[in-house]
Amino acid sequence: QEKWWALPPLIIGESDDYTQWKRASNLEEATDPATFQLLPNYRAELIRSAGKNEGSWVSMAFDSQGRLTVAREDKGLIRYTLSEDSRKVLRTEIINDDLKECRGLLYAHGSLYVNANNSNALYRLRDTNGDGVFDHKKLLHASKGGSGHGRNDLALGSDQKIYAIHGDSVHLPKGMSDRTSPLRRKFNPFRENEGHVI
């Protein structure tokens, strides 16, 4: 009998058991967009599948020039320059090779903000001379704790502030109130880690 993770096709449902990553690791092409359930008047197209040395992709963001930045699960960021109609990749380049599992990417305020889960921190990357290379990396906020439910997505608020979403593997920052139900304290007195937004 074939192993469950080798069974084609890779279709993910609402109640998937979180094993799709194992099944996806055996595929050579991304999921067929024809299998997606989309709202009316929306469409999905496959532009590119991950190449052999590009690993698994965990997040993406577009810069002001329409280039796509993709974070690899292990480490590093890849930038794809797309054709004018956005249907082909014209250029592929590594723009960072040391930040680990960047689950959150956000272009804002002339910089790329990166929530690097396995690097345990939020960073700002800047291109200070306009040559397309991030030549300045600044640690903005380090966080202790695990990585399973770790440092996740970033969002730009209507107030132009950047919000980082952290899961319950990450320790609460000092001075932050724990707003979980006081009833659960009877069974679990205090946890250093709790899901939060900073």
Question: What residues fall within each predicted segment?
Answer:
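Beta-propeller domains with acidic blade repeats across secreted/periplasmic ectodomains
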Residues: 1-198
